[in-house]
Structures are given as structure tokens and as C-alpha cells.
């Protein structure tokens, strides 16, 4: 694997992590709050 290809793959992985992790945490947080307000 060339260094530039490795850097490209790492940027994809980091980009996905930066987007997906806060989105997942946010969804879990909202669903937890939603459950509390309903019951």
C-alpha cells in the first residue's frame, strides 16, 4: 500500500468516526430522554 493510499483510507476512517460517533451518541441520548418524558 502506498503512503498516499494509507493516508486517504485513514482520512475516510477518521471522517466516518467524526460524523458517526456524535450522531450515535446524540440519537441514544435523545431516545433516552424521549423514553423518560413518555412514561
Swiss-Prot record:
GO biological process: photosynthesis
GO-annotated cellular components: plasma membrane-derived thylakoid membrane; plasma membrane-derived thylakoid photosystem II
Keywords: Membrane, Photosynthesis, Photosystem II, Thylakoid, Transmembrane, Transmembrane helix
Deletion consequences: Cells have about 30% less PSII and a minor uncoupling of the antenna. Modifies the quinone Q(B) binding site, increased sensitivity to high light (2000 umol photons/m(2)/s); the PSII dimer is less stable under high light.
Membrane topology: Single-pass membrane protein
Subcellular location: Cellular thylakoid membrane
Chief location bin: membrane
Function, in words: Involved in the binding and/or turnover of quinones at the Q(B) site of photosystem II (PSII). PSII is a light-driven water plastoquinone oxidoreductase, using light energy to abstract electrons from H(2)O, generating a proton gradient subsequently used for ATP formation.
Assembly notes: PSII is composed of 1 copy each of membrane proteins PsbA, PsbB, PsbC, PsbD, PsbE, PsbF, PsbH, PsbI, PsbJ, PsbK, PsbL, PsbM, PsbT, PsbX, PsbY, PsbZ, Psb30/Ycf12, peripheral proteins PsbO, CyanoQ (PsbQ), PsbU, PsbV and a large number of cofactors. It forms dimeric complexes.
The protein's name in its UniProt record: Photosystem II reaction center protein X
